[in-house]
């Protein structure tokens, strides 16, 4: 089984195997999750100063902010043209 990588915008890449959820940042509970992650030091801001459009939650409790729409991230996750790394190649 290889490692599947997904582009979350501006050349930032995340391991797709570690994703738990891709959500919109608009609701109050998600804003609370973002603030709690910031307080714990588990927030990764990959927006490059742009508006946050997607919040990615990982199985390690890291919260990643992306400037790409959640639908776009999900579409990249489901396509076959994504980046895949075989463990044998490493």
UniProtKB/Swiss-Prot annotation:
Pfam families: RemA-like. It comes from the Bacteria. InterPro entries: RemA-like. HAMAP family: RemA (MF_01503). Belongs to the RemA family. This is Putative regulatory protein Cbei_1140.
């Amino acid at each position: 089984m290889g490692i599947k990588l997904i582009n979350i915008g501006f050349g930032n890449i995340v391991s797709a195997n570690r994703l738990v959820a891709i959500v919109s940042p608009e609701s109050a509970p998600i804003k609370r999750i973002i603030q709690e992650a910031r307080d714990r030091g588990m927030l990764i801001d990959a927006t490059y100063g742009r508006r946050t459009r997607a919040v990615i939650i990982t199985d390690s409790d890291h919260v990643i902010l992306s400037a790409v729409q959640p639908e776009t991230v999900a579409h990249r996750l489901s396509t076959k043209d994504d980046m895949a790394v075989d463990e044998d190649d490493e």
